[in-house]
Amino acid sequence: MTAAASAGRLLLAVFAVAVFVFAQAAGEDNAFMPKGGRALLLDLLGVPPDQTELRAIAQARRTEPEWRDFVAARKSALTERELATLTAYLAVNMPMSEDAVKRGNLASALPPDGRDLAWSGCQPCHSLFASHLTQRRQVQGWRNMFLSPFHRELKMSPQEREEFARYSALNMPMKIEDVPPDLRF
């Protein structure tokens, strides 16, 4: 790679970080987006979550239908879409590594969910509205997005990419009126 190309990439990265920091400083957050699996799990377990119960969930290996039965048995007020989002999150991300499970505050060690990944991964480079929030794709369509050269370079694990794809297929597109005006287009 030439020095000019390296400098250009560095400048682009600095600009993207500056835009992200500015948006955060302006008080914008992702609360307008449908909750992801991590947020739904913490809501389901209550505040603060019982560490023993959270640890048992973090160490469990279940299929997606088994996770669905597990969550449904809790008699929570989740919508069908939220139930699907949470069970997809659990199926993709559990069990967690032993090192993560041993942390004192396990809730903070939970893997990011699709909403977190979209907010931190898409917005720094391009409009979240045009690139994500208004797109309707099946899971494979979202996975295919990571095949493009610029998306292949994203620092996301295969697990994070799958989480993003599953969340996005279940929760996108959003209605235009549900997106804050400052984040449209």
Label every model-predicted segment.
Residues R137-F146:
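Short cysteine/histidine-rich metal-coordination sites, predominantly Zn2+-binding motifs
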